[in-house]
Amino acid sequence: MSDIIDEVISSFKTSSIFINREYLLPDYIPDELPHREDQIRKIASILAPLYREEKPNNIFIYGLTGTGKTAVVKFVLSKLHKKFLGKFKHVYINTRQIDTPYRVLADLLESLDVKVPFTGLSIAELYRRLVKAVRDYGSQVVIVLDEIDAFVKKYNDDILYKLSRINSEVNKSKISFIGITNDVKFVDLLDPRVKSSLSEEEIIFPPYNAEELEDILTKRAQMAFKPGVLPDNVIKLCAALAAREHGDARRALDLLRVSGEIAERMKDTKVKEEYVYMAKEEIERDRVRDIILTLPFHSKLVLMAVVSISSEENVVSTTGAVYETYLNICKKLGVEAVTQRRVSDIINELDMVGILTAKVVNRGRYGKTKEIGLAVDKNIIVRSLIESDSRFADLWS
């Protein structure tokens, strides 16, 4: 058995494909970010007052997944921090991962060298300590809140309001914010007081086109792959497939990396187009699984309801039909159902993450209705649901 492990490790160490695959990972930030020069210039100009130890304007950054928002913000802050040594501190928090008000405040405190218990303090006490920490720090602090839309939808904007009030309670030291979101309409959800305070500057990141993605992939490929293993047509195909899906650079890099890994597993010396299509299928399967495993329980029940209806002939999945099926599932499991309005919201959320499709259609004299369908393979959904909770196996059988 250990021979198998040794064989795998040996083939990994002596890869015929990669020099260093880390250059293809989404959290790698290169020395240059092509096709984002305008955004880099604008963010840097907004943050330039940090050089004089003055508070810059707050920024909201919008753009679809994989358009370079997080990479550009980290890139600019890193460069400015080196040039403005000691004049400011920057803190990055992904609020989808650090996903409670307690942990957000605790992380901010720890970034200012204030230790707090993992739990046990009130939000009011954490806030009081944060105000004191900012006052004691004595320099500017830039707080980056990534994926902030998911956090606000879950907990409302109370924490943002609290954070926006800190500057009124301190003197020299000030906090400024950079909010990053995939949702262009997110700012409309905010309390007007929070909106006026935090969205002083707004920057939109457009999707990359196929040519830009090809350029990005070519630069990364030169660092990641061994010479001669990656034909130009493979890079073009990865760029074209990612451009078709709203110009997602992260998707393009994943396609290229996984294509190389498949070539490696096949013990091939070149990456082929067929491996790109295999990579596309593998990535989609993993993406759907990861989303479903982290869904709230009632979102999984709604998804199961849509799957059940899609298996029936001549039945259209409307919101009403989905809700009726959802109620039956809740009854079978002995759980209390949520309202039809909440189920409608869940359907929209599953549409946004690409698991369902929900489109409004005009049915003549019957008026408009929303038709709901599956955006991904049904079998992948069912397997993922069963993996997340064994009770779904009984519902499907």
Curated annotation (Swiss-Prot):
Superkingdom of the organism of origin: Archaea
Organism, as annotated: Saccharolobus solfataricus (strain ATCC 35092 / DSM 1617 / JCM 11322 / P2) (Sulfolobus solfataricus)
GO BP terms: DNA replication
GO MF annotation terms: ATP binding; ATP hydrolysis activity; DNA binding
Expression induction or repression: (Microbial infection) At least 4-fold induced following infection by Sulfolobus turreted icosahedral virus 1 (STIV-1) in strain 2-2-12.
Similarity-based family: Belongs to the CDC6/cdc18 family.
Miscellaneous field: Strain 2-2-12 is a substrain of P2 that is highly susceptible to infection by Sulfolobus turreted icosahedral virus 1 (STIV-1).
Nucleus in keyword set: no
PTM notes: Autophosphorylated in vitro.
InterPro entries cross-referenced by the UniProt entry: AAA+_ATPase, AAA_22, Cdc6_C, Cdc6_lid, ORC1/CDC6, Orc1/Cdc6_arc, P-loop_NTPase, WH-like_DNA-bd_sf
Entry function: Involved in regulation of DNA replication. May play essential roles in origin recognition and cell cycle control of replication. Binds to DNA, with a preference for molecules that contain a bubble, a fork, or a tail. Inhibits the binding of the MCM helicase to the origin DNA and strongly inhibits its DNA helicase activity. Also regulates the DNA polymerase and the nuclease activities of PolB1. Stimulates the DNA-binding activity of Cdc6-3.
Protein name (Swiss-Prot/TrEMBL): ORC1-type DNA replication protein 1
Alphabetized CDD domains for the sequence: AAA (cd00009), Cdc6_C (cd08768)
PANTHER family: CELL DIVISION CONTROL PROTEIN 6 HOMOLOG, CELL DIVISION CONTROL PROTEIN 6-RELATED
